[in-house]
Amino acid sequence: MMYAFLRALMRTITRVYLAGLFEVVGVENVPLTGPLIICPNHSATLDPPMVPAFVPRSDTWSMAKSEYFRRPLVRFFFYAYHAFPVVRHSADRAALRRSFDLLKSGQALIMYPEGTRIESGVLAKPEPGAGFIAQKAACPVLPVGLTGTRECLPKGARWPRRTRVSITFGKPFLVQQKRADGTRVSHEDASDAIMVAIAELLPLEQRGLFSEVELHRKRLTGVTAPIADPPAGEGRA
């Protein structure tokens, strides 16, 4: 109940405050049931509360840096918003276990492949964790492109600015463990492939390390596979 209320509150605040400036694109691409790894880019504090609010599923969970869970009141709200702690830049076994348990039970996991907020606002090198989880769970990955969130809530700002913000859901795909020739796909290449899919949803100026999309696609041939006719919904969150 608390999660549903917080999501509805976030949607309402966003749509009212950013009236005429906010849009959600591609929500029909989101599988409404079954295990799903949702991977957005991350350049603003606004991203983690916004993404779950507009995913048209109520069974989404998010990884959040463990530092947020040190204070009881903050920890309460993070858990209420379906977030669980992860120790960044490490092989956090507890977080990995929680992730696989959620996916095994058919729920959705939101994780940011870069592993942290990228203050430059452009795509950076991802951590291998997203690729590892996607390969081991063998479930669909949904790329998400966020634009305008950094401008809306810059680092250090006390109040959001009225600026254009968009959430674009791409088409889900699978990350392979082996290429067609039998060579193993590394976790690093798997994570890079996820970032390329995110880059395709962003304007060129936000693509950063993945600006040369076609070159990366060629390098990563056989790392991903499309999903035919994913179970998608027509409605809006």
Name the predicted role of every residue range.
Residues 20, 89-93:
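A conditional alpha-helix N-cap/helix-loop micro-motif detector
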